Amino acid sequence: MRNYISIALLLLASSVFAYDPPTMGWSSWNTYRVNISDKLIMKQADAMSRNGLKEVGYKYINIDDGYFGGRDASGELITHPVRFPNGLKQTVDHIHALGFKAGIYSDAGRNTCGSFWDKDSLGINVGFYGHDRQDADYFFKEIGFDFIKIDFCGGDAKQNFDQLGLDEQERFTAIHNAILATGRKDVRMNVCRWNFPGTWVHDVAFSWRISQDINPSWESVKNIIRQNLYLSAYASEGKYNDMDMLEIGRGMSEEEDKTHFGMWCIMSSPLLIGCDLTTISEKALRLLKNEELIALNQDVLGLQAYVVKQMDGVYILTKDLEEVNGNTCAVAVYNSTDEERTIHLDFADFYLRGDVSVRDLFERRDLGKYKDRDFSVTIPAHGTRIFRLDGLERGERTVYEAECAWLQDYQEIRNHKAFETAIYEDDGNCSGGAKVTGLGNRDSNYLEWHNVYSREGGLYLMSVDYQCAENRELICQVNGVVVKNVEAHPAHEVASEQIEIRLKPGMNRIRLSNGNSWMPDIDRMVLQKK
């Protein structure tokens, strides 16, 4: 069997395009909430050291909410007198001695989420607010933590006793700067705002939550996948969308657990185990140690799979592996429905040509070589199948859906209509079943494809598919140069305008914008080499 983890590590060492991969490890919140202790954390670290998880890439042991004991007279944090009577340093030293990295938790406001929702009274007035430099020095210079999850209950007036409403960008940026001021450049900061907070987060965090808290149910997993389907553009340059901690081994069916883990892997979410590692079942452990799925998550390109097509609740997603526009890609067929479905894969959707070798990554076995439209798969209800495809050659990508594009003003924490920010929206008339609406009316509210690949460069005919109920205009830029102002005429279905553009060899950026008025809704862009 091919050792995909070894291949990924080799490429990581040699490729100039390699990025730090998503965080892998264990976190205390899902199973224990605030009911933790130093002994419990060390037992979990010991278990992760014994059961082979370290060898496949899990290396962070994260202490979530529940360790706080208030502050002393000088404002320094102190730990819970019963749960952590000896402080945090002893626990962190134990974690480090096992060869792991240690993570911690705090809040951008005054109180933690546990103090409000779990009535953990010692979690009041322990957040970063008013103590940014002091707490950063404590966590990262004095104690030696390597990771931090930062919540926002203390900044959300509905979730703190002071009814304190804070600005997310200001608070998380200030904390980011305080961490940098410690001299530590290796700390991974996770922003926990429970929805995509805005593109500013890419500049301050290693990862960010895109949904409400997970729970061990199919509806929760399905909803989180749904929220992340069209966020692939924001997982870039070694920064990742966080789908929340894993609920593997906590009561869902085998197929649901497989979908949960497989989709977290191919969508490049952090992989933080949330169950009790001292009692984990062999079946759950085997899934969590699947090296071939982990290799998708830890791939050197750091890409999140994007939606190629959807068919009545079945989604096909893909991403390149090891080399951009190379001959290898991963494909997930995800069945969100309550019925078994049979799907035929068309390898042309992935631009693979000739015989294609197919490997099932759940079963960890080769399925043989297939030609275009010759491969079908049956997916049970709530199930997912993930394949590695190796083709003889690869054509250039020609279709770029709008829902795969970067929206500069995109955010999900406030009403997009009130704040006039663009958003992804389902629309059965559009090619991929979705579009981008609410674009334009200011310079920053634009759409941009960051990853338009051309092998040789040259002239292309670019077709922009759109919808609008009235005459509208968009400005097309290629690599920062305005190419054309496009007049879009009323089209309740989908209409198209064509533009001749020139691409350079390698990666290109194509932007659609209008700083003065509203743009049409954008369905997709199609490129044809001239």
Q: Where in the sequence are the language-model features?
A:
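N-terminal signal peptide c-region/cleavage motif recognized by signal peptidases
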Residues: 13-15
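Structural recognition of the beta-strand scaffold that forms the well-ordered cores
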Residues: 22-28, 57-64, 101-106, 146-151, ...
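Aromatic-lined carbohydrate-binding/catalytic grooves of carbohydrate-active enzymes
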Residues: 40, 44-161
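Aromatic-lined carbohydrate-recognition surfaces of secreted/lumenal glycan-active proteins
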Residues: 100-118, 176-198
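Glycan-recognition surfaces
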Residues: 125, 181-276
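Carbohydrate-binding surface patches
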Residues: 264-267, 272-274, 310-352, 382, ...
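Glycan-recognition and catalytic regions of carbohydrate-active enzymes
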Residues: 272-337, 416-440, 506
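Extracytoplasmic
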Residues: 341, 352-358, 365, 369-530
